Curated annotation (Swiss-Prot):
Functional description taken from the UniProt entry: Participates in sensing carbon and organic nitrogen status and regulates some steps of primary carbon and nitrogen metabolism.
Presence of keyword Zinc: no
Stored SUPFAM superfamilies: GlnB-like
Transit peptide start and end: 1-68
Protein name: Nitrogen regulatory protein P-II homolog
GO biological process, one term: response to sucrose
Major localization listed first in the record, in broad terms: plastid
Listed GO CC annotations: chloroplast; cytosol
Start-end of Low complexity biased regions: 1-12, 32-46, 63-74
Pfam families for the chain: P-II
Keywords carried by this UniProt record: ATP-binding, Chloroplast, Magnesium, Metal-binding, Nitrogen fixation, Nucleotide-binding, Plastid, Transcription, Transcription regulation, Transit peptide
Complexes and interactors: Homodimer.
């Protein structure tokens, strides 16, 4: 039986020198600490001012109640405008109640027009004075348009809802449209002075002043 030295000499005599290395042990999987250290070294080698931070925590999600509260706050946004046109689509037989309520507020400039249409809830039935109307056919409605100052918008909307609501499908809708300016044709007045033709805030303030 040959010794290790004899085997090495025999291999060298054949012109081939063989080195026997022990098998390499498997590397352990990288840990979170190892990965973080590598990222920190990479960030420093790139000359970053701040080391790269690794956050392994799951992303924070808002609870449903907080999300709804944020949506409600965003829904109250109104574009900046001095005047607004309040456009309401109403049942014809509710118009006298709405106009009477607006007159009590001092709103006199109202434009109404007869329109026809149906809502997105096609196929439902609207009842009035014992008769039924299918909402998939055009129904007679009244469009009421009022131009008021910004300070009066909420009061006018609340009054229309109070007088026009029945609680059934088909009560209508209200649209708020910003108005850039108001011009009186007869005199050429603009802005607050011309808004008096709509029974607006300027008209109410001037009528409330005592006559000396």
């Amino acid at each position: 039986m040959s010794s290790p030295a004899t085997a090495a000499a025999a291999a060298a005599s054949c012109g081939v020198l063989r080195h026997h290395h022990p098998p390499a042990s498997p590397r352990p999987p990288p840990t979170t600490t190892t990965t973080t250290s590598r990222l920190l070294l990479a960030s420093r080698s790139r000359g970053l001012q701040r080391p790269l931070r690794v956050n392994h925590a799951p992303p924070r999600r808002l609870p449903p109640t907080a999300a709804r509260a944020q949506s409600a706050a965003a829904a109250g946004y109104q574009p900046e405008s001095e005047f607004y046109k309040v456009e309401a689509i109403l049942r014809p037989w509710r118009v006298p109640y709405v106009s009477s309520g607006l007159l009590q507020m001092g709103i006199r400039g109202v434009t109404v027009s007869d329109v026809r249409g149906f809502g997105a809830q096609g196929g439902s039935t609207e009842r009035h004075e014992g008769s039924e109307f299918a909402e998939d056919t055009f129904i007679d409605k009244v469009k009421m348009e009022i131009v008021v100052s910004k300070d009066q918008v909420e009061a006018v909307v609340d009054k229309i809802i109070e007088k026009a609501r029945t609680g059934e499908i088909g009560d209508g809708k209200i649209f708020l449209i910003p108005v850039s300016d108001v011009i009186r044709i007869r005199t050429g007045e603009r802005g607050e002075r011309a808004e008096r033709m709509a029974g607006g805030l300027a008209d109410k303030l001037s009528s409330a002043m005592p006559i000396s």
